[in-house]
């Protein structure tokens, strides 16, 4: 029989292995009972008269260390589940607390006084992570006497001496009730009250008092407070559960969300997602029944809830043990380690760490779905309890109903028999500006598996396209962004089978901060924002193009499908283009739209790769691009797709400089598609640029200086800079001649483009680029582009566009002065570049980023340019990388004409247009092979050595 999952029948998943089985279902070999051996050791010590505090602490410390080591060993050998290990650690702590409480009662007798020790919070729930606090409540009848205070202090100081992290409070029952009324955190911690030692009656009375107090308005206030607290926590730790370095405890879909469901359920309904360990509780404390036992969860949902608890606790314990601290963030450096320990190996093209993280993200999604299923039950029960009547239901549009202004189905059971009604409900909400009621979300989640029958249904396809193409760009409306709802409920994966392959799929790099499915959802949202004009100030060209779309449906579907091929392995652009040919007709697109979508998906990286890694001043670059695109309409659509894609990768990926490059590339290709860039026109442009420069310089510089400057530049120079920049260059040349300066450096900020333009004028010589790159590396500047021009008099006029560590321009005078000074020092031989780079390297890459592997790669292309050999170098980004690579090029006797520098997280892609000393391409196979070896060597952190001739 096919295995059923939380939400229905599940296909065989590529990440499923032994870890997909609930850990609690595996054969476990629990360690020996530490409590009995501890008591034996204490009894033996007492019989021998070794009852001093130091003697007892030595015994406790030895047993605590031995017990914790046993738990860790059994857990890491995968003979104990995460839940079982957490319970064992809690029992270890119980043994320590109870032994010290017993000793304290003997050492500090206080006749007539009663004391009750209770565990609270997560420790009270009987679960403890290796480096978490143990929270203890010292419950007393009234004000503590000096003897009672000494007794409590004895316990606390001893626990601290044992190295335990202790959170504690000393309160009476009345104080507990009072503080719980005023503090949500205290109220929550006391929900997990668990008796440890002393007077049981106090614990029983406190539980009764808290239960009597948590009724009606206070109960409603508590539940709504936990919901608000959860939303605030999500905003703080990442509202998106699919960020690639999630917080497994506090983030959305993490352990705290499951605990919140437990707290709300127990307070409002007397049941919980899972039953905590109540060993050691007094007999009068009944076990909390589960939601499933009340019929509030299906068997599939209950199974998935238990697996989620187990999986998240297992990950959390590994995280604590590996880092040696109470670490809750699943960072890049620990992900492969935990994945390996949990048995995730590489399968095909998918790495073990990616399979592990996909399992994590699918678990987080299950937790969010569980919240959507259970929270409506709790809230509706609260309303019944506080008002005495059910919520007011009024007829809604199109045979639906509304509850508190939110749309809801009249008969949820109809979704199973008529799955199209789920899409009709969403579409009705879209057209009438009605958000979904939680009950609607609950029922869609429970019935989404029936949507598989709608894959060839034209009406469903039409509704889906309407939902896709209206991504709630108007923030004044209360309606949601519909695509995340389709994704989170599972409807999208049922409608488009290949979508389910990218759900929860991460890419183990520091460039993409979202999983593939969440990145696509964000890209569609970004497309809606562009079209609505909310980014008109930032990207005016995109808004202008979006306001006159002729192929709107094709564009939105292309955004939806542009990365869907990543679920199959291989070239995702080619795979996605093929998938589009099948998916588009299924969605009701006509043949022309289908062809457009497939073409856009195939080429969705074309503009960005060309703009950031090719010389757009080279006519061959523009002509080849125009030959591929062919149509002005396709160029417009491709630019919009490119912008939406880039903006959805990460907030740090998009910047003003990249916007400038894309805009310039777009305008040049558009001009060619309209019939421009003929050779004769190129000559006239050069002459026109020279005349504009002359007109601008007249009256500023002597005529002789103007004539000299106009004779210095070659055609590529006059076509590569605007008139204002050329006028600045003319003044630099004039000042250099006037003052006979061997080196002239000028840093000019261009904040609207997000870069600082650094221009260097000096005698051309081998290694010049490398020296400047080294100086800039020492300064902390990142080079994003460079143009190298050798003037007709043999002087080099090199221009570098640089950014600071945040991707912005250098603007402060002291920053600009430092850039100039370091470059001048490097060119005069007064700067130790290697030492400066080594110093910068000590403060660069964090340990978590070093876990990301970036394979070195060198690609040499003699077809991309008519006059240059184009060399693309891929490697791990680090301070001085560009210096090392350009040193290697210089040692190979190559001249760099332009360089284009791009980083994708930790991966640097540096592209150089080079020629030999005679100005020719490099074509000799032996020389090319040697060049490739030299460049590969330069991609390591070792200094570059000059290759043998």
Curated annotation (Swiss-Prot):
**Spans annotated as Uridylyltransferase:** 1-395
EC number(s) stated in the UniProt entry for this protein: 2.7.7.59, 3.1.4.-
Question: Superkingdom of this entry's organism?
Answer: Bacteria
Show where the ACT domain sits. 757-834, 870-949
Which GO biological process categories is it annotated with? regulation of nitrogen utilization
Q: Region Disordered: start and end of each range?
A: 1-37
InterPro entries membership: ACT-like_dom_sf, ACT_dom, HD/PDEase_dom, HD_domain, NT_sf, PII_UdlTrfase/GS_AdlTrfase, Polymerase_NTP_transf_dom, UTase/UR
Domain HD: residue ranges: 516-632
Classification via HAMAP family: PII_uridylyl_transf
Chain's role: Modifies, by uridylylation and deuridylylation, the PII regulatory proteins (GlnB and homologs), in response to the nitrogen status of the cell that GlnD senses through the glutamine level. Under low glutamine levels, catalyzes the conversion of the PII proteins and UTP to PII-UMP and PPi, while under higher glutamine levels, GlnD hydrolyzes PII-UMP to PII and UMP (deuridylylation). Thus, controls uridylylation state and activity of the PII proteins, and plays an important role in the regulation of nitrogen assimilation and metabolism.
- What is the name of the protein in this document? Bifunctional uridylyltransferase/uridylyl-removing enzyme
The gene is glnD
């Amino acid at each position: 029989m096919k295995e059923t999952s939380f939400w229905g029948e599940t296909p065989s998943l590529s990440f499923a292995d032994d870890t997909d089985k609930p850990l609690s279902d595996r054969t476990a070999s629990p360690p020996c009972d530490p409590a009995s051996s501890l008591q034996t050791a204490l009894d033996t010590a007492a019989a021998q008269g070794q009852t001093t505090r130091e003697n007892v602490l030595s015994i406790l410390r030895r047993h605590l260390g031995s017990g914790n080591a046993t738990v860790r060993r059994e857990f890491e050998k995968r003979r104990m589940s995460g839940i079982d290990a957490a319970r064992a650690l809690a029992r270890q702590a119980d043994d320590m607390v109870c032994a010290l409480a017993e000793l304290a009662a003997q050492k500090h007798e206080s006749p007539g006084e009663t004391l009750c020790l209770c565990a609270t919070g997560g420790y009270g729930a009987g679960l403890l992570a290796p480096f978490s606090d143990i929270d203890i409540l010292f419950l007393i009848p009234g004000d503590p006497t000096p003897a009672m205070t000494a007794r409590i202090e004895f316990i606390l100081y001893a626990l601290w001496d044992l190295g335990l992290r202790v959170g504690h409070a000393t309160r009476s029952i009345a104080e507990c009730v009072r503080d719980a009324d005023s503090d949500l955190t205290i109220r929550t911690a006391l929900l997990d009250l668990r008796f440890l030692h002393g007077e049981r009656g106090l614990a029983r009375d406190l539980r009764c008092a808290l239960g009597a107090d948590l009724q009606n308005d206070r109960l409603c206030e508590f539940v709504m407070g936990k919901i608000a607290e959860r939303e605030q926590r999500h905003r703080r730790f990442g509202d998106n559960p699919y960020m690639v370095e999630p917080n497994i405890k506090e983030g959305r879909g993490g352990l705290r969300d499951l605990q919140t469901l437990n707290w709300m359920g127990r307070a409002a309904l007397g049941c919980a997602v899972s039953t905590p360990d109540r060993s050691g509780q007094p007999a009068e404390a009944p076990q909390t029944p589960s939601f499933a036992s009340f019929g509030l969860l299906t068997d599939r949902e209950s199974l998935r809830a238990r697996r989620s608890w187990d999986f998240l606790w297992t990950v959390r314990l590994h995280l604590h043990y590996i880092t040696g601290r109470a670490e809750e963030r699943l960072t890049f450096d620990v992900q492969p380690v935990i994945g390996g320990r949990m048995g995730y190996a590489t399968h095909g093209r998918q790495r073990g760490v990616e399979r592990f993280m996909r399992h994590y993200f699918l678990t987080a999604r299950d937790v969010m779905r569980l919240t959507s299923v259970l929270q409506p039950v709790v809230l509706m029960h609260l309303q019944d309890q506080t008002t005495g009547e059910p919520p007011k239901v009024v007829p809604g549009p199109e045979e639906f109903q509304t509850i508190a202004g939110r749309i809801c189905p009249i008969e949820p059971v109809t979704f199973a028999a008529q799955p199209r009604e789920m899409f009709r409900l969403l579409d009705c909400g879209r057209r009438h500006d009605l958000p979904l009621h939680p009950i609607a979300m609950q029922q869609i989640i429970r019935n989404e598996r029936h949507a598989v029958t709608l894959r060839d249904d034209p009406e469903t396809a039409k509704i889906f396209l309407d939902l896709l193409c209206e991504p709630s760009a108007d923030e004044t409306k209360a309606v949601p962004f519909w695509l995340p709802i389709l994704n989170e409920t599972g409807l999208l994966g049922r409608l488009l089978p290949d979508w389910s392959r990218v759900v929860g799929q991460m890419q183990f790099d520091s460039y993409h901060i979202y999983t593939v499915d969440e990145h696509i959802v964000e890209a569609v949202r970004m497309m809606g924002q562009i079209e609505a004009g909310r980014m008109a100030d930032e990207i005016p060209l995109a808004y202008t193009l979006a306001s006159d779309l002729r192929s709107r449906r094709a564009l939105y579907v292309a955004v939806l499908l542009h990365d869907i091929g990543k679920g199959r392995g291989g070239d995702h652009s080619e795979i996605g283009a093929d998938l589009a040919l099948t998916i588009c007709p299924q969605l009701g697109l006509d043949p022309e739209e289908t062809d457009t979508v497939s073409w856009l998906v195939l080429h969705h990286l074309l503009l960005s790769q060309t703009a950031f890694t090719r010389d757009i001043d080279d006519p061959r670059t523009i002509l080849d691009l125009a030959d591929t695109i062919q149509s002005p309409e396709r160029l417009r659509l491709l630019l919009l797709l490119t912008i939406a894609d880039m903006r959805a990768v990460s907030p740090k990926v998009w910047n003003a400089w990249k916007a400038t490059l894309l805009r310039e590339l777009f305008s040049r290709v558009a001009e060619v598609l309209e019939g421009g860039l003929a050779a004769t026109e190129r000559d006239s442009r050069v002459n026109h640029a020279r005349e504009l420069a002359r007109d601008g310089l007249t009256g500023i510089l002597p005529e002789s200086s103007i004539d000299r400057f106009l004779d210095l530049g070659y055609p590529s120079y006059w076509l590569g800079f605007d008139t204002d920049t050329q006028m600045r260059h003319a003044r630099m040349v004039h000042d250099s001649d006037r003052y006979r300066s061997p080196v002239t450096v000028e840093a000019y900020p261009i904040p609207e483009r997000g870069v600082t333009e650094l221009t260097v004028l000096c005698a051309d010589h081998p290694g010049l680029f490398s020296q400047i790159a080294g100086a800039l590396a020492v300064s902390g500047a990142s080079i994003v582009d460079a143009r190298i021009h050798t003037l007709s008099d043999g002087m080099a006029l090199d221009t570098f566009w640089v950014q600071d560590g945040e991707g912005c321009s250098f603007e402060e005078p002291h920053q600009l002065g430092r850039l100039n000074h370091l470059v001048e020092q490097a060119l005069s031989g007064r700067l130790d570049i290697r030492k400066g780079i080594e110093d910068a390297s000590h403060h660069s890459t964090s340990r978590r980023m070093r876990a990301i592997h970036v394979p070195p790669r060198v690609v040499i292309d003699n077809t991309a340019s008519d006059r240059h050999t184009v060399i693309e170098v891929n490697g791990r980004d680090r301070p001085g990388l560009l210096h090392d690579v350009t040193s290697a090029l210089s040692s190979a006797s190559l001249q760099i004409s332009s360089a284009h520098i791009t980083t994708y997280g930790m991966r640097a892609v540096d592209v150089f247009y080079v020629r030999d000393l005679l100005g020719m391409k490099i074509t000799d196979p032996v020389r090319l092979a040697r060049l490739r070896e030299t460049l590969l060597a330069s991609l390591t952190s070792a200094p570059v050595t000059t290759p043998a001739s």
